Amino acid sequence: MAKVLLGFMGVGKSSVAPYLNGRFVDMDQVIEDKIGMSITDFFAKEGEASFRQIESETLEELLQEGDDVIISTGGGVVVTECNRKLLKKNRKHNVWLHSSFDVVYNRIKKDIKNQRPLFLNHSKEEFKAIYDGRMALYKGLADLVVTVDNRTPEEVARFIKCM
């Protein structure tokens, strides 16, 4: 089974994955290639339900690719029951990259290049509620929890490799 990096948006999944041993696949990039536009544009045009359907199909495909693949998921991959069931089948390989809300919030706020609809369309308080709601979902799926605050992507990857 594949190694799957889970965690809230902005936690550094796509930054850590290339430092791990294996074939790196950025799930968001795979989805964008499939839909022919950015996820932000797709969300605006087709809505969240359509996006989550494509996300589930993509996750199922990627989980079948073999033991050598390192999948960097989108932060919302855990919100649908279908995806959680797929990830539970992958039980021994789910790594939750955890970061405090303030660190994640500030990273996303500074990332002008990568504007995220969930961030842009909610107040800080609403965004915190979304963050809090997802923490239990990540925890329920994680075989390994790595706190990434004050660690470089290389340090996080070294820690994961040691486990």
UniProtKB/Swiss-Prot annotation:
Binding site for substrate: 28, 52, 75, 134
Role, per record: Catalyzes the specific phosphorylation of the 3-hydroxyl group of shikimic acid using ATP as a cosubstrate.
Keyword Oxidoreductase: no
Catalytic reaction list: shikimate + ATP = 3-phosphoshikimate + ADP + H(+)
The species this protein was found in: Streptococcus thermophilus (strain ATCC BAA-491 / LMD-9)
Coiled coil: none
Cofactor or coenzyme needed: Mg(2+)
Gene Ontology MF terms in the entry: ATP binding; magnesium ion binding; shikimate kinase activity
Originating gene: aroK
Location (main, coarse): cytoplasm
Lineage: superkingdom: Bacteria
Protein name from the UniProt record: Shikimate kinase
Cofactor remark from the record: Binds 1 Mg(2+) ion per subunit.
